[in-house]
């Protein structure tokens, strides 16, 4: 939920800073207002047009690890839509493998991405734990 903003907040101001999702895949059912943007290959931003008839599929860091970078985690952000005076609702479904699932890059993806593993051998549970520590959501103990 992104609460309505006052008239003094500029259109295009960032509401959720650029990031990639930690999980495997995110499914996003059409948001109630515009604002989602994805980064293109040149570092520019592309507005994502979604509605109640669309499901937006966003690959995350875990999928990037498993595919040795063939499928990149999508860098995205949320900016103020032209009408930021109304609430914006978004219903993401973050999918995670079980903690014991091995996210070691698969041989077929290593072969397709230059022949060398670019990402670590790690379980989904340890991957999530490390990332949550990195962003300060849990302590390293």
Task: Give residue spans per PLM region.
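C-terminal flanking tails of non-heme Fe-dependent oxygenases
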Residues: 1-141
């Amino acid at each position: 939920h992104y609460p309505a903003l006052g008239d003094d907040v500029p259109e295009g101001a960032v509401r959720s800073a650029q990031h990639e999702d930690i999980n495997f895949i995110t499914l996003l059912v059409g948001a109630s207002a515009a604002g989602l943007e994805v980064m293109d290959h040149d570092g520019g931003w592309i507005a994502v047009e979604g509605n109640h008839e669309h499901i937006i599929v966003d690959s995350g860091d875990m999928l990037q690890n498993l595919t040795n970078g063939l499928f990149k985690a999508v860098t995205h952000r949320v900016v103020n839509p032209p009408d930021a005076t109304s609430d914006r609702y978004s219903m993401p479904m973050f999918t995670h493998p079980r903690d014991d699932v091995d996210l070691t890059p698969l041989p077929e993806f290593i072969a397709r991405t230059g022949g060398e593993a670019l990402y670590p051998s790690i379980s989904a549970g340890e991957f999530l734990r490390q990332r949550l520590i990195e962003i300060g959501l849990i302590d390293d103990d």
